[in-house]
Amino acid sequence: SVYYGSIEAGGTKFVLAIADEHFNI
């Protein structure tokens, strides 16, 4: 399964792409 999300921290937006055995920030 793949999850796409976004986190806003310090006024900067980070995009997360997470797969079962893959972690990409």
Swiss-Prot record:
Entry EC number(s): 2.7.1.4
pH effect on activity, per entry: Optimum pH is 7.0-8.0.
Known regulation of activity: Inhibition by zinc ions (Potential). Inactivated by EDTA.
Catalytic reaction(s) noted: D-fructose + ATP = D-fructose 6-phosphate + ADP + H(+)
Keywords: ATP-binding, Carbohydrate metabolism, Kinase, Magnesium, Metal-binding, Nucleotide-binding, Transferase, Zinc
Further facts: Two isoforms, fructokinase I and II, have been found in this organism.
Family stated for the protein in its record: Belongs to the ROK (NagC/XylR) family.
Subunit structure: Homodimer.
Protein's name according to its UniProt entry: Fructokinase-1
Originating organism: Lactococcus lactis subsp. lactis
